[in-house]
Amino acid sequence: MKRAFLDNHYDSILTANREKILAGGNGDAFLEKALTDSRMALVVLIRIPSDAAEKINRCIDDLKGIEPNLYYYPAEDFQITVMDVLKGEEGRRIPPNINEYIRCIEECSKDISPFKVKFDGLTASDNAIMVRGYYDDQLMVFRQNLRDMLKQRGLSLEERYKTISSHITIARLHSKFQNPEKLLDFIEKSRLFGTMTVSKMEISFHNWYDTKKEVLSILEL
């Protein structure tokens, strides 16, 4: 995916939410029960390696000095959402035809080779802070192939929106930002978190915050 396209995407998120952030943002009421959240989803995702995670954690340490009361994701929950196959719904259970989904996803993964994702900079919405990710075309190919194959096989796809980014959500807002101007200054500074080679992806049944998860399959590329 071209860098300019993703730059525009991440920039537009921040621009659209700037005034909301300055006004304190819009808190996520569900965060009070993040550990027991039962809005479960079937997803394909990418876990983040330790070297990039360490750099992100150092950034989080700095963020805590500005906004100490945010919900900060632990390193083991850092992820790139490749595809929300079945969206997060309260009390959702693993579907009885899960093996059909797994076979479909596994077949699509065989059509791509390992690819790179570069983590460069931050962006933010009115209730979340994200690391910007820039990916090779292989990820775009996989996403479209999976959409097509699920449709061909009559399997439901509940993508909340057409996924085009490769961001990592690292923090979420409980109630109100305490220092929104300082936060925006921090987010807009240049920072590089490194590049990872994606050689495997994960099929997971997890909740909104990834605090409850069941790994259903590991896809080796």
PLM segments and residue spans:
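Histidine-dependent nucleotide/RNA phosphoesterase domain, centered on the 2H-phosphoesterase fold
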Residues: M1-L221
